[in-house]
């Protein structure tokens, strides 16, 4: 099991399958949840067994799979025998959540009306509502999803306190294209991890810059750096999981957008500044993790420079002159709201800077924090961690230095988000 695994450790999940072609994705979801440390108890409807076998789900979950309330060999989530042969009661006792994936239009309608004519609907109805949340991953044809009856059902289920995940869009098994597809297993897993994450940043709007910038020399060449953006993207994911509204301003990287995050793609430092100033107006926390180029070519060519001089520009090695790029962190941190954030005033923007150094990390980080005018500066040794999945961080404020030892960037991002929430006086 990898270091990133274990985010569902200790969780007991009842995975329900209703009938639908998307049942094949449930196999991958089951495997992924088990890999993350969860105990997974699978319950299938009769219709689901037309699309996926019990043998497959039993092999992946490592547990007996149930399909009928009359199964007389039932065991509970905790592995104990059910002496009273009431799996619709016992399977949910001690469970942390029930997730139905796929959840068909028919099964949603059944839940809405409180019908209980099979084991899966029975255990959903009999679950302790305050203790065992119910999560649905819809899967159906686009017309079925768009049908007013389905949309009314979804709205009422949400009003009843049931979590209904969004649907995917794209090619469907019937040959049509549109929304209504069940999310992919990794998307559902991410949503499930977020569901269990304490909402320490609920009500906050976090603005994050990530990745490198690209400064053009001519239309096909430019100057950039080795930043992968992985740290910033990990922070964006962790902040969204903690309940924040997150806007991620990303330089030129090829990373997937974290679930629940609004992404704004930019290229140059000037582009990033314009976007940063725009979105800082509504943000309450600004985290500047991007590796912004300090300089840019003063006069980028409007056509490709030719070595042989055929472009009429003389050929040979181009003579480049540079101008300084805008200081994005300082510009936002020294704004009126940024200054309020530094002093801890109400309505301020709490700014967090990053320093990627090659040596003398502590002294350089301390100096940069003062120079930029931010309450918190995060330092790391850049050349050793660019593009890597692991890092070590140093959190520097006016009075203390806190070391976050070598760990995955995912784990470090979670630690950083928890630290920021604590500094803002919110529960972690």
Task: Specify the residue positions occupied by each region the protein language model found.
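A cross-family phosphate/adenosyl-ligand binding-site feature
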Residues: 1-136, 141-428
């Amino acid at each position: 099991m990898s270091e990133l695994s274990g985010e569902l450790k200790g969780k007991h999940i009842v995975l329900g399958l209703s009938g639908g072609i998307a049942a094949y994705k449930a196999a991958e979801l089951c495997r992924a949840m088990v890999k993350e440390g969860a105990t997974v108890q699978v319950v299938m409807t009769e219709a689901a067994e037309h699309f996926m076998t019990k043998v497959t789900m039993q092999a992946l979950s490592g547990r007996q799979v149930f399909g009928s309330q009359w199964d007389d060999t039932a065991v509970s989530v905790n592995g104990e025998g059910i002496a009273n042969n009431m799996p619709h009661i016992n399977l949910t006792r001690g469970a942390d959540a029930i997730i139905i994936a796929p959840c068909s239009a028919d099964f949603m309608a059944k839940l809405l009306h409180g019908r209980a004519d099979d084991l899966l609907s029975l255990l959903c109805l009999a679950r302790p509502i305050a203790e065992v949340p119910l999560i649905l991953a819809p899967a159906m044809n686009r017309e079925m999803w768009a049908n007013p009856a389905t949309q009314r059902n979804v709205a009422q289920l949400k009003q009843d306190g049931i979590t209904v995940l969004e649907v995917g869009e794209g090619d469907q098994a019937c040959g049509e294209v549109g929304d209504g597809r069940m999310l992919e297993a990794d998307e559902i897993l991410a949503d499930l991890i977020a569901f269990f994450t304490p909402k320490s940043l609920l009500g906050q709007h976090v603005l994050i810059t990530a990745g490198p910038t690209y400064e053009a020399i001519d239309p096909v060449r430019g100057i950039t750096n080795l930043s992968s953006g992985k740290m910033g993207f990990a922070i964006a994911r962790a902040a969204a999981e903690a309940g924040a509204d997150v806007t991620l301003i990303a330089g030129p990287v090829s990373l997937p957008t974290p679930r629940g995050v609004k992404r704004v793609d930019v290229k140059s430092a000037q582009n990033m500044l314009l976007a940063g100033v725009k979105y800082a107006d509504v943000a309450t926390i600004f985290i500047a993790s991007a590796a912004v180029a300090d300089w840019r070519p003063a006069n980028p060519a409007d056509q490709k420079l030719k070595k042989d001089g055929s472009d009429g520009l003389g050929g040979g090695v181009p003579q480049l002159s540079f101008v300084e790029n805008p200081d994005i962190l300082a510009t936002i941190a020294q704004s009126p709201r940024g200054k309020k954030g530094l002093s801890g005033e109400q309505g301020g923007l709490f700014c967090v800077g990053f320093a990627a150094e090659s040596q003398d990390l502590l002294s350089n980080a301390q100096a940069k924090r003062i120079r930029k005018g931010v309450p918190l500066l995060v330092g790391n040794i850049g050349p050793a961690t660019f593009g890597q999945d692991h890092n070590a961080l140093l959190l520097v404020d006016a009075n203390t230095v806190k070391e976050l030892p070598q760990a995955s960037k995912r784990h470090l991002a979670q630690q950083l988000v928890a630290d920021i929430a604590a500094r803002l006086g919110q529960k972690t």
